[in-house]
Amino acid sequence: MIDHEPPTANQATADNVFAVAARHVSRLREHEAAVIAQAGHALAERMLAGGTVWVFGTGHSRAVAMELAGRAGGLSAMKELVLEDLVVSRWATKDDLVNGELERRPEAAAALVEGAAIGAGDAFVVISHSGCNGAPVEMALLAVGRGLPVVAVTSLEHSRTVRSRHPSGLRLFEVAAISIDTGAPYSDTAVRLGPGPEGPEEAGGLGVCSVSTFAGILVAQALTAEIVGCYLHAGVAPPLLMSRNMHI
């Protein structure tokens, strides 16, 4: 049996992570449920009419995109646009992808859109914690330019703190018709651990454990539920994806 020292007030124990996560879940439910419902209805309207919802996220935001498109319990009418495809097609190099260069380049979004069969009845969900990088902002602008609705999943606190890297000077929430705020902090960290890099505990400690991913995934699942509810209300069977690892 391991004898643990009692945690200090700012120590990043698993229990602290659970507590912070619970607060964020409560905040999302209280402040964003109506926005999520609005977004779900807007997307469902397009899907029920035969449209596709295109989902785009870069970096760790792609984890949220993957919760919406191409997974068990999700909807087949949601398709993901991925930067990795630009490496496969030799439009970009693997280094561009790994070092984060691609997500800063507006032309990367343009290249993905050019290669996709986007229709006049489609819609977009663009996910970006910071909301400032060139590719997500360009993706939203290209969709708006085609007259397509855009739902953003982003941190308004972070986005309002930083300048856009897009030539337009716009951030994602300033382009999207509907913006769902994950509530993730500017640092995107949930808890503080020990002394800070420039001083003792008063300096704030080391930020660990991201917020944007688990908050974004919760938003993605809530969006899916809203859309499925719209299908059922319309008397239409939702095009759900089932796990390929089930024996039926």
Where are these regions (language model features)?
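Residue-level recognition of alpha-helical structural elements
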Residues: 10, 32-36, 237
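Glycine-rich phosphate-binding loops that contact phosphosugars or nucleotide phosphates
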Residues: 48, 55-225
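Generic N-terminal amphipathic, Lys/Arg-enriched alpha-helix
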Residues: 1-31
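Internal alpha/beta core interface subdomains
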Residues: 225-228, 232
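A short, charged, Gly/Pro-tolerant segment at domain boundaries
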Residues: 233-248
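A short, well-structured juxtamembrane/interface segment
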Residues: 31-49
